[in-house]
A protein has these predicted regions:
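Intrinsically disordered, low-complexity repeat tracts enriched in Gly/Pro/Ser/Thr and acidic residues
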Residues: 1-251
Length: 251
């Protein structure tokens, strides 16, 4: 497209000040229309350098914002459309796809604290599949909706704890598997980040609990496997404590 400008008999004119007197253009024209390569300057210090079609920023160019931020990439109808790099004055950046001035498609975003996200965007928000990393080594890989963990995903903490399962609004919600680095494992339901519902809990020494949880604690009836005696025992738990095993004295 840029090469086509060579065949359009474009001409250079003196700097043109728009009637509003808020911006000045200097560059190429086609007849009486801004067309080709040029520079547009605003009174607040913002500046666009690149290509124009019918008076609008198009194809490719670089916009310098008055606050020091820059966008360099593809344009259509005065808006970022296509691939481009937005660099904040503080060093944060987004490198990826755009649609009508919003992040849309695939991209990578980094923040000043070292956090980063690489994945899908829709209308300026993290939406779809992506990977979010924190500077302490924590990482989430999975589905996003409206910038939040939502759907299936895997979260790994810096201390190597790991959760694989369902999420809703940044919280573990639904079925999942939580593993600890010492070998413990919870396999069951979550509600708003807390264990709730039926689950199976494994200890590294061979103990197993199958039963119900409420508000993050064992609560209700359950079955407990004692590896030392190689037996299963049915019992009752309240707020994380074993009240009794059926057919036995209180424990």
């Amino acid at each position: 497209m840029i090469n086509n400008f060579k065949d359009m008999n474009l001409i250079l004119k003196p700097p043109y000040e728009f009637p509003s007197k808020r911006r000045i253009y200097y560059g190429e024209w086609k007849d009486n229309e801004i067309y080709g390569r040029g520079v547009q300057q605003w009174l607040d210090g913002s500046r666009y350098e690149g290509y124009f079609i019918e008076g609008k920023a198009s194809i490719r160019g670089k916009l310098y914002h008055s606050n020091g931020d820059t966008y360099e990439g593809e344009w259509q109808n005065n808006k970022a459309n296509g691939h481009g790099l937005y660099l904040h004055v503080g060093g944060e950046y987004y490198d990826g796809d755009w649609k009508d001035d919003k992040q849309n498609g695939r991209g990578k975003e980094t923040w000043i604290d070292g956090s980063s996200y690489e994945g899908d965007y829709v209308s300026g928000k993290r939406y779809g599949y992506g990977i979010f990393k924190w500077p302490d080594g924590s990482e989430y890989e999975g589905n996003f909706c409206d910038n939040m963990f939502n759907g299936k995903g895997k979260y790994t903490w810096s201390d190597k704890r790991e959760y694989i399962g369902e999420w809703e609004m940044n919280q573990m919600n639904g079925y999942g598997i939580f593993k600890w680095p010492d070998g413990r494992k919870y396999q069951g339901d979550y509600k708003r980040d807390k264990k709730e519902g039926f689950c199976v809990f494994y200890w590294p020494d061979g103990r197993i609990f199958k039963g119900h949880w409420f508000n993050g604690k064992q609560h209700g009836e359950g079955d407990f496997y004692d590896p030392k005696k190689n037996i299963w025992k049915k019992g009752l738990w309240e707020n994380g404590k074993n009240i009794k095993f059926f057919g036995q004295n209180e424990s």
